[in-house]
Design a protein with these regions (language model features):
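Short amphipathic alpha-helical surface micro-motifs
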Residues: 44-46, 106-111, 174-175, 201-202
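Feature targets compositionally biased, intrinsically disordered low-complexity regions
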Residues: 10, 48, 146-147, 221
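Short beta-strand-loop-alpha-helix junction that forms the active-site gateway
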Residues: 127-150, 163-166
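An N-terminal, globular interaction/scaffold subdomain
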Residues: 12-83
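Non-catalytic C-terminal interaction segments of nucleic acid-processing enzymes
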Residues: 1-41, 152-292
Length: 292
């Protein structure tokens, strides 16, 4: 694997310097159906055109727009939401209000089923989860954009750049499930969540249910490199179906460790504060409980 974090820049692998790839970079274009022809990530006038970064031997999708390749995510979500042969379309960035008419956030895509007169029959909500980045990825990006020929194989050691799966779960995925997810569940509407396989692997395992009984479909994708064209292609790795409550609990509730470990840690800190030469043994859990 390269010794720099840049997997894809403006839609193409960093070592792809073909005329097509260079045209996208020169014009700062997005090949994956952004709301505008150009990339608008981070700054509209100076976009951070990094679609994905290396994560060890894998590639992590960091831009949610990257998932729009070939519109596979829309097709896969529709298959979960609606029966076969249903007439449907997708709408982007739809505001969702709560019972107090306050915004609970925008839904990335709402897929709408309709009859032959254009009247809504049903709908489902599709959320797309990119991954936060820890470290400064703009610096290697700018270095690459200034001299792509010499920087495509650069060794980048100035900053450590990596996907931040924990923050992505706590700051993005969990709030979306809590606020928007609860409203949609109360309405009896299905939800689909799109994630990269690396992100999904960091989540707790979910109790599975049959597709027909599920509230949520977790659509898990990866990137496959085509060596002939030197381009990555989005592929669905698997789909997992869950009930809403079970999924929410697994995402928002922490894994609870033993009390003894925390008490031992407290004892170490207390020993440091008191400056004891001979620290007492940490009390057992049974001793603590018997004194209460």
């Amino acid at each position: 694997m390269p010794n720099h974090p840049l997997a894809e820049v403006f839609g193409f692998p960093a070592d792809n310097l073909s005329p097509e790839a260079e045209r996208y970079r020169l014009n700062r274009l997005c090949p994956y159906h952004n709301k505008a022809p150009s990339c608008t990530k981070d700054k509209a006038k100076d976009p951070l055109g990094v679609c994905s970064i290396f994560d060890g031997a894998s590639v992590a999708i960091t831009c949610p727009v990257r998932f729009r390749q070939d519109w596979l995510i829309i097709e896969d979500a529709a298959r979960f939401f609606f029966p076969a042969n249903t007439s449907w379309t997708s709408l982007q960035e739809i505001r969702l209000n709560d019972g107090n008419n306050q915004s609970a956030g925008n839904i990335d895509f709402v897929l709408v089923a309709y009859d032959d007169r254009g009247r809504i029959l049903d709908f489902g909500a599709l959320e797309v989860q990119g991954v936060y980045i820890s470290g400064n990825v703009r610096r290697p990006f700018e270095c690459y954009m200034e001299d792509r020929l010499n920087c495509k194989d650069m060794q980048w050691t100035s900053t450590r750049v990596a996907p931040d799966y924990l923050s992505s779960s706590r700051k993005r995925l969990a709030p979306q499930l809590i606020y928007k997810g609860n409203i949609l569940k109360a309405w009896g509407k299905k939800q689909a969540v799109v994630l990269h396989e690396g992100f999904f692997s960091t989540l707790p395992s979910f109790p599975q249910t049959a597709p027909a009984e599920a509230d949520i479909a977790w659509l898990v994708y990866g990137l496959e490199l085509d060596a002939t064209t030197n381009r990555y292609h989005l592929q669905r790795r698997r789909t997992e179906y869950t009930a809403f409550g079970a999924a929410l609990d697994r995402v928002i509730l922490p894994s609870i460790g033993p009390l003894e470990t925390f008490v031992s840690h407290l004892q170490d800190k207390l020993d440091e504060k008191l400056g004891e030469d001979h620290a007492p043994d940490a009390p057992a859990l049974g001793d603590i409980l018997s004194e209460e």
